[in-house]
Amino acid sequence: MARRNFKVLYVSGEVSPFVRFSALADFMASFPQAVEEEGFEARIMMPKYGTINDRKFRLHDVLRLSDIEVHLKEKTDLLHVKVTALPSSKIQTYFLYNEKYFKRNGLFTDMHSGNDTKVNTEKIIFFNVGVLETLQRLGWKPDIIHCHDWHASLIPLLLRTVYASNEFFKDIKTVLTIHNIYRQGILPFKIFQKLLPEEVCSGLHRQNDEVNMLYTGVEHVDLLTTTSKQYADTIRLDGEETYGLGRILEERKENLHGILNGIDTRQWNPATDKLIKKRYSIERLDGKADNKKALQEEAGLSVDAERPLVGVIAGFDEFQGADLLARSLEKLVALDMQLVICGSGDKVYEKTFRDFAEQYPEQVSLQIEYTDAFMHLAIAGMDILLMPGRIESCGMMQLFAMSYGTIPVVYAGGGIIETIHELQEGIGSGFIFHEYTDDSLVGKLSEALAMYSDEERWPQLVHEAMSKDFAWKSSAEEYDQLYRQLLEP
């Protein structure tokens, strides 16, 4: 095939820095840029949530993308589109907005979240159909629509049914990346029946009276990827780690590929990072202490250069380990350390963490709403990053952390272990606990804290972590190959 610049549209429910709940947002902040550097033209579409500040991110209206009619079976809603460039790039990012669906601040949720499932189901249908209607109005035809997680999983089915006879969409291929198999988008079937034609509804994967969005996407997409080879193997097993998708993923294993995450080293580099207190490098680490002091001050903790500072940056749900963290708190506060917890999500966990922060104000800090700048400072200022997630597809935070000399302590679930050289005989880049229990977590963290006090071995560990190359280059090349194979006639 003659090499040409193909076009790829990325569709996601979250993109950093506009909105962030999970590592998906960090992935979307850098991966499209890496793909562009391989010779593709990349663009992004996402919802315009009420939390997204137009002025801060320089969003502007596009006259020809206003009042787009989105025809659903029982009604027609209007879609308005705003656009800006992904920061530090020229990648056009389109924000799909309808006041009824997106003025509310919440991200997409499903029946297991306890939120208004009727509105959320209508919102997800509107968004998926709206992406395709926006492409038609825009007149920009991608060669590939690359969907991410359950939020965009209806698009492959729509292309195979109601849009199949539309010449504009002819020959468009679809890719679905599974970042989080725990969140599958379980929604009431009756809402789909009200809004979508029978040819679409008959292709939905139903479980009694519920639709599984992610399963539907897996069934109808052309190509499947996830963010590590280990995770690709894990989710094909028909066990509890697959949450019901193991069998269909095993059936589609020839179309399932695991490719490791990377990071944008232009955005995440302590030697050039403009968002941290003081820049530093593997050759000159003294600046890390300044960032620790700044983080302690900003988080409201007592300033103590000697006391180890441990951080957690994760959404508050069981997939990301909020349950394990909550069970471990009593033992964690008994350790000689400080703890910064950054995240949001389940209100029960938020209350648990807030209560501990109020009970131990000089030792525990909770940051529910935080900026991109604070996250950079946290990564630079922490001594240790604790990742209690049950099964990480790959993770991004540990990659950021190691690049900044912050040592990860992680659970051995999923593909995260592909990125960390477990400490053995004094050599490694992080710590891994192998049982999903509070004793295992606290025990491994205690090992890390003990090494932190070793003035000879800890700097060696930091040096090993910072020496690793996590740039997107090799992973982007793998995607380049997959994309081109998919598009071969």
UniProtKB/Swiss-Prot annotation:
It catalyses: [(1->4)-alpha-D-glucosyl](n) + ADP-alpha-D-glucose = [(1->4)-alpha-D-glucosyl](n+1) + ADP + H(+). It is an enzyme of class 2 (transferase). GO terms for biological process: glycogen biosynthetic process. Its EC number is 2.4.1.21. GO terms for molecular function: alpha-1,4-glucan glucosyltransferase (ADP-glucose donor) activity; alpha-1,4-glucan glucosyltransferase (UDP-glucose donor) activity. InterPro entries: Glyco_trans_1 (IPR001296), GS/SS (IPR011835), Starch_synth_cat_dom (IPR013534). Pfam families: Glyco_transf_5, Glycos_transf_1. NCBIfam families: glgA, PRK14098.1. Synthesizes alpha-1,4-glucan chains using ADP-glucose. Belongs to the glycosyltransferase 1 family. Bacterial/plant glycogen synthase subfamily. This is Glycogen synthase.
